Every structure is written in structure tokens, then in C-alpha cells.
């Protein structure tokens, strides 16, 4: 399901293509509200259990409200990337082992690849795109740049989200606490020490601010 | 991920009154971290996923006069952060804190952790039809078995992956199960079953039964507990061997002690023999190692996992030392 759609070789870049596709999927997903009534039910002696093959959900992503129709097997990661065009959250292992898809769900970091979109109904999500305010980067983003907290950069959104979750709860973490908080994120370039330095720098800047 | 329908029950009674007519048609989902990974890996293909989180009020930690009650849908993160658990049941606190990663602890639940499926790589490989998946043999027996069971194997050599289970069993926890026949409360240790009982399952739960609550009795005065987990990586992983220990200790002597090992058998493994040897004697490394060896005499390691016997001695010694 999270497999990248086959790309067509045209003059577009891959990113343009994927973004264009995502936008199309968004409008297609939001318009046919009738689909939301695709409800069946399981009859039991203790009443009927609502059974959905499609469901209308409302969620807040980066302080913007979205209402859309999702299928039960769609993950939050899929919805963010393919329907809401927020491709900053990365698909890596897609089975809850690497942390590339980490987002904040009501303030807590979760793997969006193992979180069903139907469950995000009524929740507040923060992705990497929601951290900067206008032209000003979040202190953690700034620190990752200044301290070279990335090499290839693919795991970076996940690491930044986990770091923000840590610093929101503990603005002066020890190295041990930082390592623990980031233990659910993998960096295959092995840039961990720089990442930990970036978190320490961000923590210092945030306390000063 | 193969598509499925999602059912959102409002009460546990609705779940227990589901008729199970076709194999694996329904699967109950708590946190979903294990279930969805199994669906993605095409190990199971349920038609309907029953979302237990749509049932209100199954997430709580309540202190009462005869112990603490934990709702099955309480997140592992909440369990790990709770000060009552941390102060009174350190084994449970340490076990919850050692499960997976921060993200997974925010998603996973106490009940789900107790009911998770094994990590055996033959079981997790969709191409392999082992006994646990209805096939005719256990591929670990003569295959790659570094992480497999040294005790209680036979038909299937999985180890139970739960961290909470050994800790809770050492703490004498009980669980409440809602079933179509009524509701029961049983000791957690009776929940788990060996492959010889039913090779397809790790516990007694039927597809339409719900593990609703965990109950831990009050700790006795001066009772201490701990959970020690050996993993192969520097960061999060499933236990290679773990030891949960509870007891009362003074002057370097345990007046009573309960020991449960994880990572060595298809069920959490109580070391009664070792308990009897350790009880009442001055703790030394020699004593703990000898007691473990004695208790693991019946172990039948496979080609690659004999090291677990010696590792268990060390892990248990570390756990015991931390309580002195």
C-alpha cells in the first residue's frame, strides 16, 4: 500500500509528479462524501457493531483541519503522504522498526506506518512540515543544520520529530535521556553523535529563548 | 496491506457475542503494532479487524485496597511513566520501559503486549508454512535457531516475546477475561500454553474472548522486584534472555523469592527449583549460577542456542544483585 506509485518519465521531476498526484487524490478523496456511508454492521446478540469499509474522518494536521474518506487498511502515513500531500514524513521500513515515519499524535511520537488512519479521527497530528513558523525554522531544525545532524537526510524528519517530542517534555535532557528518546529512530549513515549534539544545541537555544 | 473492514464495537459484550464461524475471519486489535505488521507481512489476512479502542474506559491504572487494576488498553508508555507502578512494582515499570521504542510504547498496550505473537523468523516469513501456521514441521528445529527456545519446545521452538509477562507473573498478577461463557479471572501464569497443548496458539484466548484487565496484588512489606533484560543490540530489541525477580531480602539473604525467565521457552518460565536453592542462603555468584544450572537441567538446547543456559545464569545473577 505504501509502495510508491510507478513514475512516468516526462519532463516533471519525481517530486513534482508525486506532489501533483497527491493533490489530485486529495480533491478526489474529499469530494465524494457519499462514500462515507459505506457502512455495514455485524449483528450480535448484544446489538449491532458498526462495520466500515470506508470511513469519513476529520483530523487536524499542523493546525489545519482536514475531512476525508479513508479505507480501513490505509495508514496515517499513507494518508499524510498520498492524500494530504505532506511528503516530509518518510516511508522507510513501513513496519514499525526504523522511525522514518514518526509524527506527533496529540503531542506523542508514534510510527504513522502502523497507525490506521481511521483511528486518527479527531486527533491532532504534527508532521515535519508543521514545525517551522513562517520563515523561521524550529530550533531543532536549525540545530540539525548547524551541527550537521544528518548525512543523506532521509531519516532526518523522523529524528527531528522525536527530538521535538523529547524537548517538549524535558527541555534539558542528559545525553542518556536523548539517546533513549531517539532509540526508536534509525540512521543508516550512522550519524548518531552529530544528531545528539544537535539535540543538545537545540535544548540550549530553547532554554535561552 | 491487504484490505479489511473495521468493526467498532461499543461494549466488550458485543465482541464476545461475535460468532466465530470461519478461521481468522475476525482479528481483535488493541494497539495494532503487532497485528498490522502481521497483516502487512501477509502472515494473516483477516476480513474484519475489530478495533477494541472504540470501546470506552479500557485504559486505566487504579489503586485499590487489595492491589492495582490495569485496563488492558492502557498504553505501555503510561504504564512506564506511572509513579505508583514505579514505586511499588519496579519489575513491571522496568519491563514496560524496556519494551520496544518510545513510539511503540505510545501505541502498544499492556493487554496487547501479553497477547503478541512470536518473533520466530520462520513464523514471520510469509513464504514458510511452519507448524504454527498449519504446516507440518518446525523449521527452527534443524534450521537457524540462535534465538529459539531451550525449554518447553518439541513441536515448536518459539520463545514468548512479552516483557510484561515474566514481570507480571513474578508479581502474582491475575487477568480478567471476558468470554461468551462468562467472565473469569485467572492467574496470568495459567494464561500461557505450551505448543503441545495447541501449536497454533500461545495462550488460551479464543478469537472472541477479550483480555480485559490485569490485577496485581498489594506488595508485602519490604518486598522488592526487578526485571533484567539482555538484548543483543545497544538499543531496543526483544529479550534474548530476561529475568523477573520478586522477593523479600535482608542481610544478603532472600526470605522468599519468585523467579520467572523470559526468552527461554514458548511461555514465561518459572524457576521454582532455583527459588528453593536461593531461599535462605547468603547470595553469591556461585549460588545463583548453581541454582540456575540446577533449574535448567531439563533444558534441551538446539544447535545454536546453548549459550542461553549460561546467559540465564548471568542475567539472573544481575537481577538478584540489584535487589540486595
What are these regions (language model features)?
Chain B
Residues 1-324:
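C-terminal structural segment of proteins
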Amino acid at each position: 500500500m505504501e509502495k510508491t506509485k510507478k513514475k512516468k518519465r516526462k519532463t516533471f521531476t519525481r517530486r513534482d509528479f508525486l506532489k501533483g498526484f497527491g493533490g489530485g487524490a486529495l480533491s478526489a478523496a474529499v469530494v465524494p462524501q457519499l462514500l462515507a456511508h459505506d457502512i455495514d454492521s455485524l449483528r450480535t446478540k448484544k446489538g449491532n457493531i458498526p462495520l466500515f469499509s470506508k470511513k469519513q474522518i476529520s483530523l487536524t494536521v499542523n493546525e489545519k483541519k482536514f475531512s476525508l474518506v479513508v479505507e480501513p487498511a490505509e495508514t496515517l502515513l499513507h494518508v499524510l503522504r498520498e492524500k494530504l500531500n505532506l511528503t516530509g514524513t518518510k516511508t522507510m521500513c513501513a513496519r514499525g522498526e526504523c522511525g522514518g515515519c514518526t509524527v506527533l499524535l496529540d503531542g506523542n511520537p508514534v510510527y504513522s506506518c502502523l497507525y490506521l488512519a481511521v483511528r486518527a479521527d479527531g486527533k491532532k497530528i504534527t508532521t515535519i512540515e508543521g514545525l517551522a513558523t513562517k520563515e523561521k525554522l524550529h530550533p531543532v531544525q536549525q540545530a540539525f543544520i548547524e551541527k550537521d545532524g544528518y548525512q543523506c537526510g532521509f531519516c532526518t524528519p523522523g529524528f527531528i520529530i522525536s527530538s521535538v517530542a523529547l524537548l517538549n517534555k524535558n527541555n534539558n535532557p542528559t545525553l542518556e535521556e536523548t539517546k533513549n528518546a531517539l532509540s526508536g529512530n534509525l540512521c543508516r549513515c550512522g550519524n548518531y553523535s552529530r544528531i545528539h549534539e544537535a539535540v543538545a544545541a537545540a535544548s540550549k537555544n530553547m532554554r535561552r529563548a | 496491506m491487504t484490505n479489511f473492514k473495521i468493526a467498532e464495537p461499543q461494549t466488550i459484550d458485543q465482541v464476545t457475542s461475535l460468532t466465530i464461524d470461519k478461521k481468522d475471519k475476525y482479528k481483535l486489535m488493541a494497539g495494532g503494532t503487532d497485528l498490522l505488521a502481521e497483516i502487512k507481512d501477509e502472515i494473516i489476512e483477516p476480513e474484519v479487524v475489530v478495533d477494541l479502542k472504540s470501546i470506552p474506559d479500557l485504559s486505566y491504572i487504579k489503586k485499590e485496597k487489595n492491589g492495582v487494576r490495569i485496563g488492558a488498553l492502557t498504553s505501555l508508555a503510561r504504564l512506564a511513566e506511572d509513579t505508583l507502578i514505579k514505586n511499588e512494582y519496579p519489575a513491571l515499570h522496568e519491563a514496560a520501559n524496556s519494551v520496544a521504542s518510545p513510539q511503540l510504547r505510545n501505541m502498544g498496550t499492556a493487554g496487547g503486549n501479553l497477547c503478541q505473537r512470536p518473533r520466530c523468523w520462520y513464523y514471520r516469513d510469509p513464504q514458510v508454512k511452519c507448524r504454527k501456521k498449519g504446516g507440518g514441521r518446525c523449521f527452527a528445529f534443524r534450521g537457524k535457531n540462535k534465538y529459539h527456545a531451550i525449554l518447553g519446545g518439541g513441536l515448536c521452538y518459539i520463545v514468548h516475546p512479552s516483557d510484561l509477562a515474566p514481570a507480571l507473573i513474578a508479581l502474582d498478577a491475575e487477568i480478567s477475561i471476558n468470554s461468551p461463557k462468562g467472565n473469569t479471572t485467572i492467574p496470568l501464569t495459567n494464561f500461557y500454553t505450551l505448543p503441545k497443548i495447541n501449536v497454533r496458539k500461545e495462550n488460551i484466548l479464543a478469537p472472541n474472548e477479550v483480555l480485559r484487565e490485569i490485577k496485581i496484588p498489594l506488595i508485602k512489606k519490604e518486598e522488592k522486584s526487578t526485571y533484567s533484560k539482555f538484548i543483543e543490540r545497544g538499543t531496543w530489541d526483544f529479550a534474548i534472555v530476561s529475568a523477573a525477580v520478586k522477593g523479600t531480602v535482608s542481610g544478603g539473604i532472600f526470605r522468599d523469592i519468585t523467579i520467572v525467565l523470559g526468552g527461554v521457552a514458548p511461555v514465561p518460565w518459572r524457576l521454582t527449583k532455583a527459588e528453593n536453592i536461593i531461599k535462605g542462603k547468603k547470595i553469591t555468584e556461585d549460588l545463583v549460577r548453581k541454582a540456575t544450572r540446577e533449574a535448567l537441567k531439563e533444558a534441551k538446547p538446539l544447535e545454536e542456542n546453548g549459550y542461553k543456559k549460561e546467559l540465564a545464569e548471568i542475567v539472573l545473577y544481575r537481577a538478584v544483585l540489584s535487589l540486595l
